[in-house]
C-alpha cells in the first residue's frame, strides 16, 4: 500500500480527493497539508511513500520544498499537480526533483494512475 502525503491549498478538494484515494485498496493518504510549511512539517514526520504537491501554494517556496523533499528522501517520488500551463514551470519542478508534473484538468483516474506509477 502506498502511503501518501497530499499538499493542496484548497481544503475541500484535498479532503475529497484524499477520501477517494482512501477508497482504493492500494492507496492511503496518511498526511495532508495546505501550505509549504505544513507540507514540510508532514514530510519531516515521515511515514510516507509518495507525495502529491499542488502548485502554486499560498506561502510560496513550493519549488524549494520539492527540491528539499527529493534531496532528503530521493526514494520518495513527488507528483506535482498544477493549473499552470507554462512548460518552463513544469521543467523547473522536474529539475527540482519532481517525478512527474500533471495538469489539474486530468481525470481522477489519471491522478490515480500517476500515483500508482510513482508509488509502486
Predicted regions: what is each one?
Residues 12, 35, 84-88:
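Negatively charged, flexible loop motifs adjacent to catalytic sites
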Residues 2-12, 17-21, 51:
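Conserved acidic segment of CheY-like receiver
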Residues 88, 106-116:
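C-terminal output helix
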Residues 52-69:
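Conserved phosphotransfer microenvironments
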Residues 44-46, 69-75, 96:
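Conserved phosphotransfer cores of two-component systems
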Residues 32-50:
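Acidic, metal-coordinating helix/loop segments flanking the phosphotransfer/catalytic sites
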Residues 64, 85-100:
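Alpha4 helix (beta4-alpha4-beta5 surface) of REC/receiver domains from two-component response regulators
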Amino acid at each position: 500500500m502506498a502511503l501518501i502525503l497530499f499538499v493542496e491549498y484548497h481544503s475541500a478538494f484535498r479532503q475529497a480527493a484524499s477520501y477517494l484515494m482512501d477508497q482504493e485498496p492500494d492507496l492511503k493518504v496518511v498526511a495532508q497539508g495546505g501550505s509549504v510549511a505544513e507540507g514540510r512539517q508532514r514530510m519531516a514526520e515521515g511515514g510516507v511513500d509518495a507525495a502529491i504537491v499542488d502548485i502554486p501554494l499560498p506561502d510560496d517556496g513550493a519549488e524549494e520544498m520539492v527540491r528539499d523533499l527529493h534531496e532528503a528522501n530521493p526514494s520518495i517520488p513527488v507528483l506535482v499537480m498544477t493549473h499552470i500551463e507554462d512548460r518552463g514551470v513544469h521543467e523547473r519542478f522536474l529539475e527540482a526533483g519532481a517525478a512527474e508534473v500533471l495538469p489539474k484538468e486530468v481525470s481522477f483516474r489519471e491522478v490515480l494512475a500517476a500515483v500508482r506509477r510513482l508509488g509502486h
